[in-house]
């Protein structure tokens, strides 16, 4: 586990390269102009230095402002003209005589230059390029280290292109701006460190050491991006494949002459010799095989008749971190067994119930309540074998040892010794049997997921896996997804499906946003505070404090809520799948569901503020604490099984110091209940003197304006990348789908970038936890456009594979996005709850005189968590054909005649439902070119309908007539050969 260090420092990256991009100290914390004491002054501040430029935005922002030593004042900077047509600019420093330059610091106002160069000249006529860049600076403070000292009189920064990523801002920011242009004759000591080397340790094994520590400096290993390869103490673990690892060191001047810095190195770790004999093979063959990007199971035959070394199974998502190929295949036979090691039994097998069926997992009393067991993992593996449409056999789960394993069996057990695998790593030895080991049950779960992906693919009818040895582990600790279940009700069944699908891709963090309201600024209801109080809102959790009931039928989605027991059980069950559920109660903003019940506690600075709690009101703060006390109660609280809870804290527009004090109180309350706390980062935008402790506090970086990543990193907070412009989904809104190609080709979990800046937090730091994407159901209330649970699921699933690859961090990933997404489509997650497309053909005859003329005539219906789920022959309000789902009713402009047979066809697609009747077509959804769009309600823009078959025709007791119904799917293939009559 990486050890967090609270420190202020500079951060250096890639010290072995000619050009080094480095981080700044805290924004607003200005470090001295001298980087190496009096011996290495900023030469740009010297006497007689002139600064010139091609243009200025305004006269006061001249080139001279970039060499005045003042980087604290926003008015003391150079800014070029704002020219949308031409972003070519320069600023030049002319020195009175030749100087030697080794190190340059550029302090950008905005990191928006995406093509620029540092140039040098001795005569002001002929220039040479010292460093060229085709991407934006990683941080606002950019440090450039030259490969060797350069003699010069003229030093010029030339820019050629700036970011146009944001249409809204592109007209305003077509210029470049520098606070300071600093020049140094020598480079900081941290840049002079030699690359660390791997040696054999005296006690055995391998160790990473620095060749030499400079006199007067203390150098401490911070960590490695792959701590499963290089541990926190420098131990180099036994790898089976060569790995490139980035390590970071803290460099401190014990004399106080230089600033404290972080420096990083790229270290190649060769494979160790400790590989089981059964899978050892010629190193040359194995290396060649690992270069093979083919994603098939076939094993080529060598000329001597022996099987060639197996390539890494490329169809596994995310890709395997380390692979050593063997020869031949493992076959899953019907006689196979799952053997669970006897020492892997923390408590009795008899105490377990089916971990998936009915979503009911019983937790044993003698084990940690928040940890799944190997028995749970084995049961999930057995169940998945039974669900496979070709294999269809649950494997028996037996107690035993590794010696009991026979050919075709699968063994699950704890590793007998620590080898750097950590909480989620595992090994998998595949010969004629399969042996999966890990230090935790979570690691064993991920090993079984890899095995299942090998075995259960549509094209692998033989249920085989290539023999070989796997050592696999993630790059990032948090690999997540979050969903807003407040603005749109989301059934518990859908949450279970999402959780199980995440587990299939080794995504391990599911955030549930439980309370919110429609955005008041767009609601049209802000004429007064009282009017704003009528906006749509929801608190989706049973609460005695707020009077939220969560039992019985829910005729409308607005009333739907989870019981305390349902949520606690969901959190517990998810652990069995290796997924941490993070429940959230969002205050002090986004709290209309609270202030509606307690209107005196609302912030009333405007009509738009009444969804915020007035933190100047002591009773309002006490109410929030009582809500949390109920949720955290160790006996009955909905969050009692959660390891991490989210306390909200975003977009508050009240007093900054009151906000900081409130954050500190709620954080303390949750941590005293034994929880790690997560929140939406907002401290960069909320002034005040109180500094919340970063201890056990995780921060979602959703907006770089509300929480600057570098500033928060310097303050010691643990960070999760949830940057809105890359990772937010607003179904039907501005962020309708994620840009998977952008994520695949340019995005990185530790990189925060937009039109204004680019900041990279080191992956080797324990503070850089990972990333998550999020669905926000902003299109609710007055903006409701009919998004369904299926629409949510489609948007959830599409980027899942790409993000799992990036967050797991395997370096063997496909270079082509279509090939990558193609692999996702081949796999299919475990038992998805919905089918994407269908066709229903039916013959319908309504009675001329039904028994009850005003009752609905239902062709088919199904059970649902809230509202009603049915397809109408006669919708009771209009008498027309239609359907209802999730609290919304959709009407086709067609009325069935009575007493005669009519042929109907219904086609369901994402966003569109089509009815064909009597030679006419009736569409509901986005295909507006078709006549008869129904009632014209805004929610009909998204008319997705999953056709129910739980109860059909007369089985409902709500259909007077005769019916024949045929169901088809995926291009018309029949699911039922005979009509359902």
Located regions from the model:
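Active-site neighborhood of glycoside hydrolase catalytic domains
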Residues: 604, 609-696, 703-705, 709
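Flexible glycan-contacting loops in extracellular carbohydrate-active proteins
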Residues: 924-967
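Feature activates predominantly on carbohydrate-active enzymes
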Residues: 419-610, 619, 629-642, 779
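Extracellular glycan-recognition modules
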Residues: 832-887, 956-981
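Short, aromatic/His-centered strand-loop micro-motif at the edge of beta-sheets
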Residues: 882-903, 929
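Acidic, contiguous N-terminal accessory segments
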Residues: 31, 266-442, 446-450, 454-471, ...
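Aromatic, loop-rich ligand-recognition surfaces of beta-strand-rich domains
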Residues: 16, 32-38, 71-129, 138-188
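Short tryptophan-centered beta-strand motifs in secreted/extracellular beta-sheet-rich domains
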Residues: 510, 570, 842, 900-908, ...
């Amino acid at each position: 586990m990486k050890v967090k260090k609270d420190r202020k420092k500079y951060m250096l990256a890639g010290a072995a390269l000619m050009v080094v991009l480095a981080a700044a100290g805290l924004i607003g914390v200005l470090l001295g102009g001298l980087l190496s004491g009096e011996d290495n002054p900023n030469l740009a501040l010297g006497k007689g230095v002139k600064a010139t430029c091609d243009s200025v935005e305004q006269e006061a922002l001249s080139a001279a402002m970039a060499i005045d030593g003042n980087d604290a004042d926003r008015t003391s900077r150079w800014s070029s003209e704002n020219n949308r047509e031409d972003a070519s600019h320069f600023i030049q420093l002319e020195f009175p005589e030749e100087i030697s330059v080794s190190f340059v610091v550029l302090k950008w106002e905005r990191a928006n230059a995406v093509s620029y160069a540092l140039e040098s000249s001795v005569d002001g006529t002929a220039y040479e390029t010292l460093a060229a860049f085709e991407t934006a600076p990683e941080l606002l403070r950019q440090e450039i280290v030259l490969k060797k000292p350069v003699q010069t009189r003229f030093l010029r920064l030339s820019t050629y292109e700036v970011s146009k990523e944001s249409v809204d801002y592109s007209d305003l920011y077509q210029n470049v701006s520098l606070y300071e242009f600093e020049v140094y004759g020598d480079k900081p000591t941290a840049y002079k460190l030699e690359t660390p080397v791997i040696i054999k340790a005296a006690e055995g094994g391998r160790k990473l050491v620095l060749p030499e520590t400079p006199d007067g400096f203390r150098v401490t290993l911070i960590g490695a991006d792959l701590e499963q390869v290089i541990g926190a103490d420098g131990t180099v673990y036994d790898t089976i494949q060569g790995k490139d690892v980035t390590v970071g060191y803290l460099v401190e001047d014990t004399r106080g002459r230089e600033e404290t810095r972080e420096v990083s190195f790229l270290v190649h770790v060769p494979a160790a010799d400790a590989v089981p004999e059964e899978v050892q093979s010629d190193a040359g063959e194995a290396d060649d095989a690992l270069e093979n990007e083919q994603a098939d199971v076939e094993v080529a035959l060598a000329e001597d008749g022996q099987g060639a070394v197996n390539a890494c199974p490329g169809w596994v998502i995310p890709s395997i971190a380390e692979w050593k190929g063997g020869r031949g295949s493992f076959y899953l036979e019907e006689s196979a067994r799952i053997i669970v090691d006897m020492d892997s039994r923390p408590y009795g097998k008899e105490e377990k119930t089916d971990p998936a069926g009915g979503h009911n997992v019983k937790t044993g009393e003698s084990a940690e309540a928040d940890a799944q067991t190997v028995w749970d993992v084995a049961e999930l593996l057995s169940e998945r074998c039974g669900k496979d449409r070709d294999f269809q056999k649950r494997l028996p789960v037996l107690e035993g040892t590794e010696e009991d394993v026979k050919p075709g069996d699968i063994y699950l057990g704890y590793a007998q010794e620590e080898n750097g695998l950590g909480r989620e790593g595992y090994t998998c030895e595949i010969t004629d049997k399969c042996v999966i080991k890990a230090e935790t049950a979570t690691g064993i779960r991920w090993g079984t997921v890899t095995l299942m992906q090998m075995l259960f693919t549509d094209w692998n009818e033989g249920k085989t896996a290539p023999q070989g040895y796997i050592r696999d582990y993630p790059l990032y600790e948090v690999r997540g997804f979050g969903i807003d279940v407040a603005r749109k009700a989301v059934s518990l069944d859908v949450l279970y499906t999402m959780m199980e699908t995440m587990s299939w891709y080794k995504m391990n963090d599911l955030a549930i946003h439980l309370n919110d309201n429609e955005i008041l600024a767009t609601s049209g209801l802000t004429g007064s505070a009282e009017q704003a109080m009528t906006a749509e809102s929801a608190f989706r959790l049973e609460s005695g404090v707020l009077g939220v009931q969560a039992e019985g039928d829910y005729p409308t989605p607005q009333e739907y809520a989870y019981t305390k027991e349902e949520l606690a059980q969901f959190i517990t069950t998810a652990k069995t799948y290796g997924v941490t559920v993070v429940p959230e109660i969002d205050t002090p903003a986004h709290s209309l569901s609270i202030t509606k019940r307690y209107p005196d506690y609302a912030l009333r600075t405007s009509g738009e503020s009444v969804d915020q709690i007035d933190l100047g009101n002591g009773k309002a703060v006490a109410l929030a604490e009582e809500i949390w006390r109920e949720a955290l109660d160790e006996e009955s609280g909905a969050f009692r099984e959660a390891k991490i809870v989210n306390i909200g804290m975003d977009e508050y527009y009240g007093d900054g110091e009151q906000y900081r004090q409130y954050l500190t109180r709620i954080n303390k309350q949750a941590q005293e209940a034994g929880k790690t706390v997560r929140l939406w980062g907002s401290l960069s935008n909320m002034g005040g003197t109180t500094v919340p402790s970063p201890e056990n506090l995780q921060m979602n970086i959703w907006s770089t304006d509300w929480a600057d990543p570098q500033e928060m990193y310097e303050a010691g907070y643990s960070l999760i990348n949830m940057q809105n412009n890359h990772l937010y989904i607003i179904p039907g809104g501005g962020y309708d789908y994620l840009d998977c190609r952008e994520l695949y080709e340019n995005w990185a979990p530790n990189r925060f970038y937009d039109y204004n800046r680019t900041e990279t937090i080191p992956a080797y730091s324990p503070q850089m936890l990972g990333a998550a994407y999020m669905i926000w159901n902003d299109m609710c209330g007055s903006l409701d456009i009919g998004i369904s649970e299926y629409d949510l699921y489609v948007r959830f699933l599409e980027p899942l594979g790409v993000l799992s690859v990036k967050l797991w961090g395997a370096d063997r990933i496909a270079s082509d996005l279509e090939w990558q997404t193609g692999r996702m489509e081949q796999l299919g997650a475990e038992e998805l709850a919905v089918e994407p497309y269908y066709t229903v053909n039916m013959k319908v005859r309504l009675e001329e005189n039904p028994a009850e003329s005003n009752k609905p005539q239902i062709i088919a219906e199904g059970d649902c968590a809230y509202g009603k789920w049915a397809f109408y022959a006669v919708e009771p309000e209009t008498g027309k054909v239609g359907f209802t789902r999730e609290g919304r009713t959709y009407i086709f402009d067609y009325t069935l005649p009575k007493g005669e047979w009519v042929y109907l066809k219904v086609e369901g697609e994402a966003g569109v439902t089509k009815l064909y009747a009597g030679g006419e077509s009736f569409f509901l959804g986005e295909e507006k070119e078709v006549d008869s769009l129904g009632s014209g309600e805004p929610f009909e823009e998204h008319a997705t309908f999953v056709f129910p078959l739980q109860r059909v025709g007369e089985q409902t007791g709500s259909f007077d007539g005769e019916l024949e119904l045929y169901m088809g799917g995926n291009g018309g293939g029949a699911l039922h050969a005979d009509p359902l009559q």
